[in-house]
From Swiss-Prot:
The gene is acpS. It holds the Pfam family ACPS. It comes from Alteromonas mediterranea (strain DSM 17117 / CIP 110805 / LMG 28347 / Deep ecotype). Transfers the 4'-phosphopantetheine moiety from coenzyme A to a Ser of acyl-carrier-protein. GO terms for biological process: fatty acid biosynthetic process. Belongs to the P-Pant transferase superfamily. AcpS family. It is found in: Cytoplasm. The keyword Transport does not apply. This is Holo-[acyl-carrier-protein] synthase. It comes from the Bacteria. Its EC number is 2.7.8.7. Its main location: cytoplasm. GO terms for molecular function: holo-[acyl-carrier-protein] synthase activity; magnesium ion binding. Mg(2+) binds at residues 9, 57.
């Protein structure tokens, strides 16, 4: 495996909402339907949104594209495996660009503290 891209993003949690009241308009733009369901049920929705936002920003930075030019927030979904670790799942133009570049694996690390959420994404080729 070789590293094809590395991206990191940090988000100031308070920019996405106050207390337990998140910016729902932003959440609907950023989150996939499955993530939206989790967001609505989450005890700390602002933190949930901040971590998903950071992970998706880190992913597009790793790919070197940013959001736009055919790539949507909806093309990146953060899921948790059976051990609770986050995993990235790609669709649409993001998945097509990964395939075209020979990217076969992604690794994501997400963390949050009192004021910030941070994520790092590594994209790998065979």
């Amino acid at each position: 495996m070789a590293i094809a891209g590395l991206g990191t993003d940090i988000v100031e949690i308070s920019r996405l909402g106050k207390g337990d009241t998140a910016n729902e308009r932003l959440a609907k733009r950023v989150l996939t339907p499955a993530e939206w369901q989790q967001f609505c049920e989450h005890a700390r929705p602002v933190r949930f949104l901040a971590k998903r936002f950071a992970a998706k920003e880190a992913a597009v930075k790793a790919l070197g594209t940013g959001i736009g030019n055919g790539i949507s927030w909806q093309h990146i979904e953060v899921r948790n495996n059976n051990l609770g670790a986050p995993e990235l799942h790609f669709s649409g133009e993001f998945a097509a660009m990964c395939e075209a570049r020979g990217i076969t694996r992604s690794v994501v690390s997400i963390s949050d503290e009192q004021h910030y959420a941070v994520a790092t994404v590594i994209l790998e080729t065979v």
